Amino acid sequence: MLIPMSAQTADTSIRPQGLRERKKQQTRQNISNTATLLFLERGFDNVTIAEIAVAADVAKMTVTNYFPRKEDLVLDLHDEFTGGLARIVRERRAGESALAALRDAYLAAAANQDAVVGFSGPEFARLLTDSPALVGRLREFHEERERLLAAQLAAETDSAAGDFAPRVAAALLGGVHRALFEETVRRTVEGESNQSISEVLTGYINESFETLEPSLGDYAVRAAR
């Protein structure tokens, strides 16, 4: 995915380990950006790992070391995407429910036109929808995100092993995210502007969370410390 690199500084006080890590990040970003450009030009299924390596000026093994799965060359926000909801719940304020924290986060993501809820541009959106492999990988992302959210909710509510409630809550809360993501991509492919999509999503988010409020409004409220 084409994500702008953060500004790099010429700070000579950076430790050697920091320089190595920065170099790794630059290499990773170069590979991902190069691959995405090739995929946009020729289609996901028509580009090989070897061709990506040549275009990025790295060894084929370097590509697979950074991205063991070809799909992740495109979907390179794995940790942010799958762990984001659990992190929001974990970091919410005292007195705040999981429902309220996630509602605020979804509203902010829609307002900021965040890639995590599907904003990407028409070419990239078509790339996602045209490839069964990418559709399948996105489904895995959604499923993993719900598992991580369920585990966090279970920990927050001191649930017994095998308790079903955290899984149901995670499915409902994660399901809103899945629906928002799919709606954003669909509307983007159809040519709707990001601003218009953002406004529509805001309405959907409020509607969805008002529907969930009676059942989850008092669930997983962060106790005061």
Question: Where do the language-model regions lie?
Answer:
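Alpha-helical DNA-contacting segments of helix-turn-helix folds
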Residues: 26, 72-81, 141-142
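Polytopic alpha-helical membrane proteins, predominantly small-molecule transporters/carriers
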Residues: 31, 35, 52, 122-123, ...
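C-terminal peripheral helix-coil segments that are non-catalytic and often amphipathic
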Residues: 1-11, 151, 182, 186-225
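Alpha-helical transmembrane segments of multipass membrane proteins
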Residues: 177-178
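Amphipathic alpha-helical packing segments from all-alpha helical-bundle domains
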Residues: 132-158, 164-168
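Basic, helix-initiating cap at the start of DNA-binding domains
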Residues: 1-58, 75, 84
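Short hydrophobic/aromatic patch on the recognition helix
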Residues: 58-67
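Hydrophobic alpha-helical connector segments
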Residues: 76, 83-124
